[in-house]
């Protein structure tokens, strides 16, 4: 379960930004999860709640967004998007020579803070 490690690192970054902007607490966090990141969203939500306990982000609303993986098809020379690792064929030409160009793992997209 690597979700706990991802959440711990995300919390470090969230706390840094909260301190930088004088936040009393974090009220919302938006995370983008890459299609091929092997992150289980329910586990991520559970771990996030767990690591945030006792921090400036305790009780904040977690918003999760799943991102499609962008790939380059060597066969038809087109950019295509895939939703899952199980589908490894180009949806346009059905070729199997795909190169992942954007999956982005896990990204913090937005942090909402309360400064009062």
UniProtKB/Swiss-Prot annotation:
Gene it is expressed from: hypA
Chain sites annotated for binding Ni(2+): 2
Chaperone recorded as keyword: no
The protein, known as: Hydrogenase maturation factor HypA
Superkingdom per UniProt: Bacteria
Entry keyword set: Metal-binding, Nickel, Zinc
Physiological role: Involved in the maturation of [NiFe] hydrogenases. Required for nickel insertion into the metal center of the hydrogenase.
Claim: Zinc is one of the keywords in the record: yes
């Amino acid at each position: 379960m690597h979700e706990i490690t991802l959440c711990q690192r995300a919390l470090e970054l969230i706390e840094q930004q909260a301190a930088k902007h004088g936040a009393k607490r974090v009220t919302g966090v938006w995370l983008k999860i890459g299609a091929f990141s092997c992150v289980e969203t329910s586990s991520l939500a559970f771990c996030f709640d767990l690591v945030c306990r006792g921090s400036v982000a305790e009780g904040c609303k977690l918003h999760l967004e799943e991102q499609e993986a962008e790939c380059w098809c060597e066969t038809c020379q087109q950019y295509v998007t895939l939703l899952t690792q199980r589908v490894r064929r180009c949806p346009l030409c059905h070729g199997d020579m795909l190169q992942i160009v954007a999956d982005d793992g896990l990204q913090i997209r937005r942090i909402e803070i309360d400064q009062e």
